[in-house]
Amino acid sequence: MAHKKGGGSTKNGRDSNPKYLGVKAAGGSTVSAGTIIVRQRGTVIKPGNNTGIGRDHTIFSLVDGVVTFRNGRNDKKRVEIVPS
């Protein structure tokens, strides 16, 4: 007879690495060109004036200015930069 219990298998015990998604520059804050404004999965927030979008849907600033969030058509949220 075994004097130790067998190590049973389990379906738990895993965790994924954090992805650090979300808004990185709040509305009204001043940003410089190239600053990441939003990191997201899919286009939850659409890019507006003076912003660009990366291949992973990250929205970033193209000019120096102030971040502005606004609601566009069809309930789509947009972020844009007002140049300073």
UniProtKB/Swiss-Prot annotation:
Keyword Ribonucleoprotein annotated: yes
UniProt keyword annotations, A-Z: Ribonucleoprotein, Ribosomal protein
Entries under InterPro entries matching the protein: Ribosomal_bL27, Ribosomal_bL27_CS
Gene3D superfamilies to which the protein is assigned, alphabetical: 2.40.50.100
Single Gene Ontology MF annotation: structural constituent of ribosome
Disordered: annotated span: 1-21
Gene Ontology process terms (BP): translation
GO cellular component: cytosolic large ribosomal subunit
Similarity remark: Belongs to the bacterial ribosomal protein bL27 family.
Name this polypeptide is given: Large ribosomal subunit protein bL27
Biological source species: Chlorobium phaeobacteroides (strain DSM 266 / SMG 266 / 2430)
